[in-house]
Amino acid sequence: MDARWWAVVVLAAFPSLGAGGETPEAPPESWTQLWFFRFVVNAAGYASFMVPGYLLVQYFRRKNYLETGRGLCFPLVKACVFGNEPKASDEVPLAPRTEAAETTPMWQALKLLFCATGLQVSYLTWGVLQERVMTRSYGATATSPGERFTDSQFLVLMNRVLALIVAGLSCVLCKQPRHGAPMYRYSFASLSNVLSSWCQYEALKFVSFPTQVLAKVSKVIPVMLMGKLVSRRSYEHWEYLTATLISIGVSMFLLSSGPEPRSSPATTLSGLILLAGYIAFDSFTSNWQDALFAYKMSSVQMMFGVNFFSCLFTVGSLLEQGALLEGTRFMGRHSEFAAHALLLSICSACGQLFIFYTIGQFGAAVFTIIMTLRQAFAILLSCLLYGHTVTVVGGLGVAVVFAALLLRVYARGRLKQRGKKAVPVESPVQKV
């Protein structure tokens, strides 16, 4: 579906998304509303769970509880601290993906269309709603400007709760491999994932959605850096080349774009810092999840484990700040926001399932192409709905970025054909 038609469909379903050509306003100047203060408060809330938990894990390990423990708590402690089986690196690897013998080209084409449509609809809708929730007011009338939703952490919780429910149902309804990873190891990926999502939502208060999309694309560079630091990976020359092209394209876009309405150098700098935080945290999440897959878990099990701790962290932090009740009250005051937040969470959770299914059926290369096109459509859709302007030089920069991404897909395919070990794509879990 052409992005212009998709814009018409979205506006027909949610007329308020483009209402009035409203421009984003600068965030409040109160020091308690500064993003850095909120970040520190949130991080302190997460630390109030992480630090005691880490100390407990170290205590049980030093006491050799696996050999000496007993009683009702032993199975729980064993699952959380020690796990239930050795890492999969010592076992025979899983068989590669195979297609059913009766699969026909027409059936494969229909499945590919289903996957592509599901991914595009889920994440294009998610992107539109994300920008609507974080940059526009609710309850605006002719005499009242309405009020903004400002608590990004509450929105993260909404997304994670629904994703946890979907992952839990999938684990119950579909056969899963025996889980062996120590549960506490999910907490590190959960923490970085929550922080990356918070930075992502918070950044929309300061920079445009197209800028955010290009920043996500450019995270290839820190992912490579984290890969060297965390996983000790080596990279091919073409990967450094495409990473450089992505950097050039993003720079062309950022330097050629004019300032957003009511923006200032200070707010733009805040947005760029938040995007840098998103990229760094998300890069760590991807590499940590890759290491966790050594325990031979399924993607749905990974999704459940990460979201379980994400819900624990965000609920605890919101309760400590007294913000959970305020977020619930905001939903009660504005039913439109409640609908947007619910649909945003549904799109995020369903998108995860489409990711797993697409990679399982067609592989990572096809999935990467679909998601690359989705990012391009997301920029176009945001410009159509919310009036973001892109200059000719900026458009060329966008083209350079996506050409570099497609070049990466092509190079990986050639390496695979030659029998070389291609660098694995970024972990698909928790893409949003």
Curated annotation (Swiss-Prot):
Keywords: Antiport, Golgi apparatus, Membrane, Phosphoprotein, Transmembrane, Transmembrane helix, Transport. GO terms for molecular function: 3'-phosphoadenosine 5'-phosphosulfate transmembrane transporter activity; antiporter activity. It catalyses: 3'-phosphoadenylyl sulfate(in) + adenosine 3',5'-bisphosphate(out) = 3'-phosphoadenylyl sulfate(out) + adenosine 3',5'-bisphosphate(in). The chain crosses the membrane at residues 5-25, 40-60, 109-129, 154-174, 238-258, 265-285, 299-319, 353-373, 387-407. It comes from the Eukaryota. It is found in: Golgi apparatus membrane. Its main location: Golgi. The keyword Glycoprotein does not apply. GO terms for cellular component: endoplasmic reticulum membrane; Golgi apparatus; Golgi membrane. Probably functions as a 3'-phosphoadenylyl sulfate:adenosine 3',5'-bisphosphate antiporter at the Golgi membranes. Mediates the transport from the cytosol into the lumen of the Golgi of 3'-phosphoadenylyl sulfate/adenosine 3'-phospho 5'-phosphosulfate (PAPS), a universal sulfuryl donor for sulfation events that take place in that compartment. This is Adenosine 3'-phospho 5'-phosphosulfate transporter 1. It comes from Pongo abelii (Sumatran orangutan).
